[in-house]
Regions:
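Cys-dependent protein tyrosine phosphatase-like superfamily
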Residues: 1-126, 130, 137-197
Length: 197
């Protein structure tokens, strides 16, 4: 006999759940992508989603995915998006291994933020390969727009990047100018989150 379908965590999102069919012959595991987290209502972040994450992503009822890598999106992921009516916004930001490499394309980050700030794209998932550096920079710049203090922006970034935190990413977030985005004041309560994380 299958286990319950509606197991929920304290944050209201599905946890890791086994879904069995009535005969118990086939089970599907519902798992979150690597480094998954809620950024704000309707905005999520993660590492690259795999097929084992599709059931979980389906439960989020995503409208859009913001993909931050230059590599082509895999066919299986494209099919998942198409089958579920999810739009794809790709910003080909190169990954960098060097901790002091400072080649983060500011204009691409700005364009990605415009997509994130547009409530018509919500619910939305922001992701790169591991959900650490490129995703961390986009979310960090969003936090600056929310008027978070820099120490809180850096704390959140470091929670995901851990030992791989990069000085160049933090410097980029510190220097990122949000004034050109202020006219796009987020209508979904993001500016109310000026609290320290």
């Amino acid at each position: 006999m299958g286990r319950p379908l509606n197991r929920r965590r304290a944050d209201g999102l599905p946890g890791i759940v086994d879904i069995g069919c009535v005969a118990g012959e086939m089970e599907e595991e519902v798992a979150r992508p690597l480094n998954f987290a809620v950024v704000e209502t309707g905005v999520f972040r993660s590492g690259f989603p795999e097929a084992g994450n599709f059931s979980f992503l389906r439960s989020l009822r995503l409208r859009s995915v913001v993909y931050l890598c230059p590599e082509p999106y895999p066919e299986a992921n494209l099919e998942f998006l198409e089958d579920n009516g999810i739009g794809l916004f790709q910003f080909g930001i190169e990954g960098h291994k060097e901790p002091f490499d400072n080649n983060i394309p500011e204009e691409m980050i700005r364009e990605a933020l415009k997509v994130v700030l547009d409530v018509r794209n919500h619910p939305l998932l922001i992701h790169c390969n591991r959900g650490k550096h490129r995703t961390g920079c986009v979310v960090g710049c969003l936090r600056k727009l929310q008027k978070w203090c820099l120490s809180s922006v850096f704390d959140e970034y470091q929670r995901f990047a851990a030992a791989k935190a990069r000085v160049s990413d933090q410097r980029f977030m510190e220097l990122f100018d949000v004034t050109s985005l202020k006219h796009l004041s987020p209508p979904f309560g993001l500016l109310k989150s000026s609290a320290v994380a």
